[in-house]
Amino acid sequence: MPNGSANKLPHVTTRRMLDMKERGEKIAVLTAYDYTMARILDRSGVDAILVGDSASNVFSGHNTTLPITVDEMIYHAKAVVRGVQAETSRAMVIVDMPFMSYQLSPEDAVRNAGKIMKEHECDAVKMEGGKVIAEAVKRITDIGIPVMGHLGLMPQSIYKYGSYKVRAKEGDEAEQLMEDARILEESGAFAIVLEKIPSKLAGEVSRSLTIPTIGIGAGPECDGQVLVINDMLGLNTEFHPRFVRRYADLSSVIEKAVQSYVADVRANSFPSEDESY
């Protein structure tokens, strides 16, 4: 991704992430869906920005991630890339491949991954699944597109699970997750998100791989962490799972600011003479 800022910093690449794991340096990832937030995240020092299909929930108001389309993901990704380029261009930009954009066939997966990369110059794509998507991951990485995997709770499979409960708590599912992680690494994935699995299992997976793991609700032994920006900033007041640490209560801040604006407009105290031409 080209750098449009005068304050150039080393861009985070897949190689840089591998180096960070080797050095024991934790990787900080957050989601973003728009230009303004991407600028803030990049200049704040995050290592990577995930343009998540969680935009389906927090941006568009859907109950699941399933409705969002490839074109909608590209729209959000273009805005995020422009935001990063306007700042330091340090953060890697990773884009979720939405539901049914890679499940039909490896050929379909390659086509859609290529479209996502070509239209907005992001750094990588992310896909949910293990052995079942291994051929698609290999085909995509073979043509030069980096792939981040995603195991554990996979939101695109929510109707299969029936709930958002912790996954891989039992032996068989835990063993399958370990195997899927190994398969993804062998297929060429440069990193794997581990979502809502026991901390001990996440540690075992992380130690068994040479590629980094990025946890969300998977404990402190992962090589990095990711959160949905709306959750960690306290913008989503109706969703507060155990794994989310709120670093701000922006919902209340925004509400108070809007109430003040409405009051000033109704009292005709805004705009003032100093705010008029």
From Swiss-Prot:
Homodecamer; pentamer of dimers. The keyword Disulfide bond does not apply. Gene3D superfamilies: Phosphoenolpyruvate-binding domains. It catalyses: 3-methyl-2-oxobutanoate + (6R)-5,10-methylene-5,6,7,8-tetrahydrofolate + H2O = 2-dehydropantoate + (6S)-5,6,7,8-tetrahydrofolate. Pathway: Cofactor biosynthesis; (R)-pantothenate biosynthesis; (R)-pantoate from 3-methyl-2-oxobutanoate: step 1/2. Keywords: Cytoplasm, Magnesium, Metal-binding, Pantothenate biosynthesis, Transferase. Belongs to the PanB family. Mg(2+) binds at D53, D96, E128. It comes from Chlorobaculum parvum (strain DSM 263 / NCIMB 8327). One of its GO terms (biological process) is pantothenate biosynthetic process. Its EC number is 2.1.2.11. Catalyzes the reversible reaction in which hydroxymethyl group from 5,10-methylenetetrahydrofolate is transferred onto alpha-ketoisovalerate to form ketopantoate. The keyword Transferase applies. This is 3-methyl-2-oxobutanoate hydroxymethyltransferase. GO terms for cellular component: cytoplasm. 3-methyl-2-oxobutanoate binds at D53, S54, D96, K126. Transmembrane segments: none annotated.
